C-alpha cells in the first residue's frame, strides 16, 4: 500500500443523471441517416438454474425464466456525439473521430429497432461538412472539429496527459495515443 487513494468512481449513477432510462438515450442520440438506434435494451427477467446453483451446479438447463417480473434496465447517458458520458473517457472518446456504441445495428428485415446482442458499433465521423450533410449526419465532421492534424494531435496529447496525471493511463499508453493521433488519416 503506497498510501494513495484510488481515483473517484466513474461508474454511471442515477444521482448525477449518467445512468438513465434507454428512452432518454434513444431521444438524445444524434441523428444519422444510416443509423437507427435500438428503441430499448434487451429485456431482462430472473432466471432459475435450480436449487443448488449457488454451489455452482446448474440443475435447470435451460433455466426457468420468471416472466412475472422484469428488471429495469438502465443505460449510460450519451453526449452530443452519442458516446457514453460516464466511465473513463479515453482519448478515443474525449477527442473522438467516431461514435462508439454498446449496441449494433440490425437489418431492416430482422428487427431494425431491436438490439442485436451486445456487440458494439463504430460510426466514423464524416471527413468534411459537405460529406456530413450528404450523409444526413448531424455530428460535426472531422474538419469542423479539428482544423488541422496538429490541432487533433494537441487535443489527444492533452487528454492523454490528463488521464496520466489522474493515474488512469500509463506513460507508454500516453505515447501510444499520441503516436496513433499523428498517424490518423
Describe each region flagged by the PLM.
Residues 1-185:
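C-terminal His-loop and adjacent cap/lid subdomain of alpha/beta-hydrolase
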